[in-house]
């Protein structure tokens, strides 16, 4: 049998909530160009991610990877903390 090569999406964003146990909410910001007017529009994506060791705080910049569904809303997993929140 041949094995499928799985490519996981990796996104970088800011932690906006860590109230749940072993879970964080990450906001990912991207800019898209309007097709007609050419103006860049800010689009945000809020993802729930699995934080196994509860090591993230609000304001941290993190990298998350897509994974199998962990719960009803969690389909992302924490890969690394890029930058800690100041203060």
Curated annotation (Swiss-Prot):
Pfam families (alphabetical): Ribosomal_S17 (PF00366)
A GO biological-process term: translation
InterPro entries on file: NA-bd_OB-fold, Ribosomal_uS17, Ribosomal_uS17_bact/chlr, Ribosomal_uS17_CS
Record's keyword annotation contains Transferase: no
One annotated GO molecular function: rRNA binding
Classification via SUPFAM superfamilies: Nucleic acid-binding proteins
Any one GO cellular component localisation term in the record: cytosolic small ribosomal subunit
Keywords attached to this entry: Ribonucleoprotein, Ribosomal protein, RNA-binding, rRNA-binding
The UniProt record lists the keyword Cell inner membrane: no
Positions of transmembrane segments: none
Disulfide bonds: none
Summary of subunit composition and partner proteins: Part of the 30S ribosomal subunit.
HAMAP family xref list: Ribosomal_uS17_B
Role description: One of the primary rRNA binding proteins, it binds specifically to the 5'-end of 16S ribosomal RNA.
Family per record: Belongs to the universal ribosomal protein uS17 family.
UniProt name for this protein: Small ribosomal subunit protein uS17
Organism of this sequence: Dichelobacter nodosus (strain VCS1703A)
The gene coding this protein: rpsQ
């Amino acid at each position: 049998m041949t094995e499928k090569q799985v490519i996981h999406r990796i996104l970088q964003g800011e932690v906006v909530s860590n109230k749940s146990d072993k879970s964080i909410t990450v906001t990912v910001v991207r800019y898209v160009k309007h097709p007609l007017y050419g103006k860049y529009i800010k689009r945000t994506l809020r993802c729930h991610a699995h934080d196994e060791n509860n090591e993230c705080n609000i304001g941290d910049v993190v990298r998350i990877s897509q994974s199998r569904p962990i719960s009803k809303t969690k389909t992302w997993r924490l890969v690394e903390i890029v930058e800690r929140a100041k203060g």
